Structures are given as structure tokens and as C-alpha cells.
Amino acid sequence: MSTLRKVLLFFFCCSLCGFAQTADELVSKNLQAKGGLEKIKAIHTLRTAADLDAGFFKAKLSSESQRPDLFRSNTIIQGMTAVQAYDGSSAWQISPFNGKKDPQLMGEDESRGLIEQADFDGPLVDAQSKGNKIEYLGHDQVDGDDAYKLKVTLKNGDILYYYLDPDTYLEIQIERQQFIRGSVRESVTLLGSYKPVNGVMYPFSIEAGPKNDPDSRAKITFQKIEANVPVSEADFKIPAATAAKNPSAK
């Protein structure tokens, strides 16, 4: 019996090692499918233009981002522009739809998603140095089709579930769990229509919204994604006059 236990323990440990290796292998295949780490790292800025259709309203979207974690998005509806931005240390926004036409610093909870989005390469690249943990959870289904499932636990405690196409190894769905003040917020993002930009594959079609309410999801269609274009770091920073009124922005 003792020998049998040792044999079973040996195979159990081997299976755990293989499980861990599979997560690394899938991440490697995903990055290779996108164009390879060298080409990914060769992109330093991005500019996008897109159309958003949320059913009851439509909007024009644009964004600029710069390595490693500068990000700004603009949402235009009926001539009014909402802004959300992160300068690497502070997140801020302009919300004219809520009657706030002056830039305002964002709180920790409301800025979490924006800061995650500002990660230029995403959580799979340099995961360990970012404090992210990646696990392989086996196979799962996305709209009836098979997919590899990865669990990504971010440094801040939020969890992402990546679903990879078994043929292309590109992500086709990402589920997000945000843990805020004792509650869990769940959302889902569907990705498709991948096209190369400077040798790196990007999704030109996205559908995003609450996980359990498909009718509330918004569809985003990218008209243009440009890489290594000139951007101004000043665009990511909260305007000086506002920052002076908010010492915590420094």
C-alpha cells in the first residue's frame, strides 16, 4: 500500500507540473498568435477610432495609449465629449452627460477598470513581474464551441477568465470579476474580426457588458487602429488648473 501511495503521489505531482506548464504554453501560443513578443513590444503607442452601438444610443469612440500605462478615451454623443484618462498615477474624467464639464479625479473603485485598460500589453504579458497569477482551467464552451480557459488573478485581486480559440489561440471571450466593497461585479467581453496592425493581431469587433444581461451589451466596431503614431503625454494628464485644486493628483 505504501508503494502504491508513492506511485499515485508521483503521478499526481507530475500532473500538477503539466497543468502549470500548460498555462505557460497557452500564454506563449497566444502571444505568438498575435505576432510574437518582439513585435508586440515594438509597438509603443496606439490610436483607435470606433463606433459604439448600445441599442438605445450610439456614439463615436476614440482612444490614445502609450507604453507602459498611459491611456485616454473619448466618447462623443450628440456633440458632447466624455473623457476618461490615466497618466500612470492618477485617473480622471470629464462627464458632461452627468452635468460635470470640468475634469474630476476618479476614486479608487471607479478607476479600477480604467487602470486595467491602461496596461498597454495586457495582463498576459510579463504577468509575473506585474503580480498577476495565471492558471489553466481546462476546456470550456463559448457559444457551443470548445475553448481553452485561463484564470488570471490580477495583483489588485480582480479575476479575468480568458477563453482562447483552440485553432488560433487568440482570445475570443474575457470574463471579468471585480471585487469592490464586498460585492462582485461581473462583465463579459466578446472579441472577433482580428486584423494585423504593424504585424500584431487586434480585434476590430467587440461586444461588452454585464455577464448575465446580453441585451445590455454594447457593440464596438473599430474603424481604425494605428500603431506607433505621435501622441502627446500632456493629453493623458489632468489639466493643470484642476490638478492645482486637487493636491492628491500630484
Segments from the language model and where they lie:
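A residue-level signal for beta-strand positions that form part of recognition/binding surfaces
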Residues: 45, 131-133, 219
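Bacterial N-terminal signal peptides
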Residues: 7-18
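A generic structural signal for short, non-catalytic loop/turn and secondary-structure boundary residues
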Residues: 9, 41, 127-129, 201, ...
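A short, sequence-level motif marking secondary-structure junctions
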Residues: 63-70, 87-90, 109-110, 165-168, ...
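N-terminal mature ectodomain segment of secretory-pathway/periplasmic proteins
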Residues: 24-99, 135-138
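Flexible, processing/modification-adjacent segments and terminal tails
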Residues: 19-32, 39, 92-158, 178-185, ...
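Positively charged n-region of N-terminal signal peptides that target proteins for export
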Residues: 1-6
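Gly/Pro-enriched, hydrophobic low-complexity segments
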Residues: 80, 145-237
